[in-house]
From Swiss-Prot:
Coiled coil: none annotated. It is an enzyme of class 3 (hydrolase). Belongs to the FBPase class 3 family. It comes from the Bacteria. One of its GO terms (biological process) is gluconeogenesis. It comes from Phocaeicola vulgatus (strain ATCC 8482 / DSM 1447 / JCM 5826 / CCUG 4940 / NBRC 14291 / NCTC 11154). Keywords: Carbohydrate metabolism, Hydrolase, Manganese. This is Fructose-1,6-bisphosphatase class 3. One of its GO terms (molecular function) is fructose 1,6-bisphosphate 1-phosphatase activity. Pathway: Carbohydrate biosynthesis; gluconeogenesis.
Length: 666
């Protein structure tokens, strides 16, 4: 018995108000019937391809290349389409053109002797690639992706079969007219961008867009204009969101990390943060201090900074680190429920002995005891200069329009977790007890765990940024955003402590250790993953948890696929700082209609070499899970929405046919 036969005049009575509204969009039986036919057709198309990336860490060049080449998918399609009919070098040239059309066109025009002939060949090739990547979508969806100025022409080229007699002549006329009207360059660029767009239907970014790398702001520029994406916030994203919300501790941490990795461009050029007051103060305060422990971590071949600038960054790094320790103490004192007293360490320093007595009762020698702005009598009090610097930095952060735009984008398209097509996506952790049960976490005197914890945390982050200054909930929310960065029960962190002070000032490696929460070991167990999937209401025969946050040590043989395929960890080390640790330069998890594939990337050289020499990211593909039957739109979340729409339209048809609602004249 089909769904329509089960609909009767009696069963639709309670839906009449909604059906009356629906009738305005579909005023006749013909309109409603046509929409049902269209939606049923969509249900039987293959699902769109989803790409999952994590822990981009400001590596703009590698990120944009992975988007442009669709993690190697475009190269595979070019090989499938042209096979042995093109030389390897010709296929490489075509791929480079698709990835970087504007730049490649400039190079071609500088060397090509018969440009019109090149245009004819290239346009025909691009049309074939475009036909291939658009074949799994409805014409309506493809049409919505087209640039307006070329929409009609591209549709004609995509939907005409050159194998049919007389059609090739028609296509040839279109192409020759494009060339003769001097629109070939613009048309090629439009086709290449369309190929990129259609190859990735949905992009999921599992957090940590910020930190370490030189250009998180440029990644955000791409994402804010991207056609279909979502973000699951990572700890570094939350840190920047806290800075934009006015949390001085978050600002100090953002600045410290920028100095640590010598990445000032995002702050100064990207967001217009004025670092001059900090630089002036640091150079005066530490004029005779080499600040050896605070030299930025930059690669030897990096010529961005000279020795003088590197020393200045080291001085700024030390200055902001001390300010950070003082600011954090203010929150720890103000929020005893955070239980972070062990992170207040400045008062434990014996400046005469140049030692510190740690919370474990043992005394340790300091690697650096020159802290002229720390008053032993009141070690956590900011000096007048430090307070003035933070006031200026505070104004810089909260008044940056570019930063506001990017953070609003993160709020609009992001959250702590996402459930998508039987996959549970979150960046780091769900706090667990040792026995694998959900851990109760106290927030403002109330207990939260699992899904409720992530939703509460998400609400607090939004309150910190969006609430008015006089909102009584805002001060706690602003403080809690910092806790999410480094607190032991934070689902974005989930370690016993963040040993920042110890890593700078103490040589004992055992004090640097940050003990991970139980989640990170228990997620290897299938039953724990199933419990978490149930907690978040994830349904489906093949359901998974997808995480980032912890780099997968591929070089040591670690497998990113865990818990009998239920858990996928896709932090493969986009950040250059992690390449030696992971042995690779990032993962892309690809979920298409045939199943899951994990694409493992080797380091990206540079955009310049990609354009000039056709150097692509070398990627290897591991099949994770393949379906015996192709997954269609009807098997996805979107498909379930469409089925609901179809059922509503069938109810509207019944209302029309039984006279409960009158058809409207047009």
């Amino acid at each position: 018995m089909n769904a329509y036969n089960s609909i009767t005049p009696e069963t639709i009575q309670e839906d009449m108000r909604y059906l009356q509204l629906l009738s305005h969009s579909f005023p006749t039986i013909a309109d409603a019937s046509t929409e049902i036919i269209n939606l049923e057709a969509i249900l039987n198309l293959p699902k769109g391809t989803e790409h999952f990336l994590a822990d981009l860490h400001g590596e703009y060049e590698a990120f944009q290349h992975v988007l442009r080449n669709a993690s190697g998918a475009i190269k595979r399609k070019v090989n499938e389409i042209f096979g042995n009919t093109l030389r390897e070098n010709e296929k490489k040239e075509l791929c480079t053109l698709i990835y970087y059309p504007e730049q490649k066109l400039d190079l071609v025009k500088a060397v090509e002797t018969d440009l019109d002939d090149w245009y004819v060949i290239t346009l025909n090739q691009l049309v074939r690639v475009c036909q291939n990547v658009s074949s799994k979508y409805t014409r309506s969806k493809v049409r919505k992706s087209l640039p307006k100025e070329f929409s009609y022409i591209i549709q004609e080229l995509l939907h005409e079969n050159s194998m049919v007699p007389n059609k090739q002549a028609y296509i040839n006329v279109i192409i020759s007219t494009i060339i003769s009207t001097r629109r070939a360059d613009d048309f090629i660029i439009a086709l290449c961008n369309l190929i990129q767009r259609l190859t990735i239907d949905t992009l999921h970014v599992l957090g940590d867009i910020f930190d370490r790398g030189p250009a998180p702001h440029r990644i955000m520029d791409i994402l804010c204009d991207y056609h279909n994406f979502d973000v699951q916030w990572g700890n570094h994203d939350i840190l920047w969101m806290g800075a934009a919300a006015g949390n001085d501790c978050c600002m100090a941490n953002v600045l410290r990390l920028a100095m640590r990795y010598g990445n000032l461009a995002a702050l100064e050029d990207g967001y217009g943060i004025n670092l001059l007051p900090l630089a002036t103060f640091a150079m005066e305060t530490y004029a005779d201090d080499p600040c050896t422990l605070f030299g930025p971590k930059v690669e030897k071949e990096d010529c961005t900074y000279n020795a003088k600038t590197l020393r200045m960054i080291g001085q700024m790094h030390k200055a902001i680190s001390v300010i950070q320790f003082k600011l954090e103490a203010e929150i720890i004192r103000r929020r005893p429920d955070f239980e972070m007293d062990d992170r207040m360490l400045l008062h434990r320093i014996d400046f005469e002995r140049k030692t510190i007595t740690m919370p474990n009762g043992k005394e340790y020698e300091l690697k650096d005891s020159f802290l002229p702005t720390v008053n032993p009598a009141d070690p956590y009090k900011l000096t007048d200069e430090e307070r003035e610097i933070m006031n200026k930095l505070h104004r810089s952060f909260v008044s940056s329009e570019k930063l506001k735009k990017h953070i609003r984008c993160l709020f609009r398209y992001g959250c702590m977790y996402t459930v998508s097509n039987s996959n549970l996506l979150f960046h780091a952790s769900i706090p667990l007890n040792a026995d694998g049960t959900l851990k109760d976490v106290s927030i403002a005197g109330k207990m939260y765990k699992g899904k409720a914890l992530l939703e509460k945390v998400g609400h607090l982050i939004r309150t910190a940024f969006f609430a008015e200054e006089d909102n009584e909930d805002r001060p706690f929310a602003v403080d809690y955003v910092w806790y999410l960065w480094c607190g032991k029960d934070s689902p974005a962190f989930d370690k016993d402590k963040m040993a920042t002070f110890e890593r700078y000032f103490l040589k004992e490696k055992e004090l640097h250790k940050e003990v991970k929460g139980h989640y990170y070991s228990l997620r290897n167990e299938e039953k724990v993953c199933d419990m978490l999937l149930d907690e978040f209401g994830v349904i489906g025969t093949h359901r998974h948890i997808i995480n980032g946050h912890v780099p997968v040590k591929t070089i040591q043989g670690e497998n990113p696929i865990k818990a009998n395929g239920k858990m996928m960890v896709i932090d493969g080390g986009f950040s250059k700082a992690y390449h030696s640790e992971t042995g690779i330069a990032g993962y892309t998890l690809v979920y298409h209609s045939r199943g899951f594939q994990l694409v493992q990337h080797e380091p990206f050289t540079s955009m310049q070499k990609a354009i000039e020499e056709g150097q692509d990211i070398k990627s290897s593909t591991q099949i994770v899970e393949m379906s015996t039957q192709r997954m269609m739109v009807k098997d996805t979340d979107k498909g379930r929405e469409l089925v609901t729409q179809i059922n509503d339209l069938k109810k509207l048809l019944m209302a029309y046919r039984t006279g409960l609602i009158k058809e409207k004249s047009i």
